[in-house]
A protein has these predicted regions:
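A short, N-terminal "cap"/entry segment at the start of jelly-roll beta-barrel domains
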Residues: 1-27, 109-116
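Conserved short histidine dyad/triad with adjacent acidic residue
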Residues: 31-45
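Glycine- and acidic-residue-biased ligand/ion/polar-headgroup-sensing regions
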Residues: 48-59, 64
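A cytosolic small-molecule/anion-sensing beta-strand core signal
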Residues: 55-56, 71-72, 90
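Structural motif
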Residues: 58-60, 67, 83, 92-93
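Short acidic-glycine-tyrosine-enriched beta hairpin
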Residues: 65-80
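Ligand-binding loop in jelly-roll beta-barrel domains
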Residues: 80-104
Length: 116
């Protein structure tokens, strides 16, 4: 398994970005992200549609040619295969849902006994 496990169930996947997979089903997966100020999520894309909700903090999200500064209560949608990246402007917490399931995030499930 890749990443650094912490006692609270989060795994650092990129410097300053920690994930905990909360639950998943047949066609979607939900994860919580702890994002440190000044962390950068590099430009990437994936075949999963992605929606998110910012609980705490402030981030700058780049999706294709659009740029948005997000604050608590804001949400977003990233289409399948859309190129995106993010800059973390304040310590932040976000919840994101991926469809179909991101198979690479199943290893970050907090409780191995979670039932689909």
């Amino acid at each position: 398994m890749n990443g650094i496990h912490s006692e609270n169930g989060y795994t650092e996947i990129i410097k300053g970005i920690r994930i905990k997979t909360l639950c998943y089903g047949e066609s979607m997966l939900m994860a919580e992200f702890l994002l440190r100020k000044d962390a950068v999520l590099p430009e990437h894309s994936h075949p999963n549609e992605q929606t998110g909700y910012l609980i705490k903090g402030k981030i700058r999200l780049f999706i294709e040619d659009a740029v948005r500064e997000l604050v608590p209560g804001d949400s977003w949608n990233i289409a399948t295969d859309a190129i995106h990246r993010a800059e973390i402007l304040e310590d932040s917490v976000a919840i994101e849902v991926f469809s179909p399931v991101r198979e690479d995030y199943l290893k970050f499930i907090n409780d191995p006994d979670v039932v689909k």
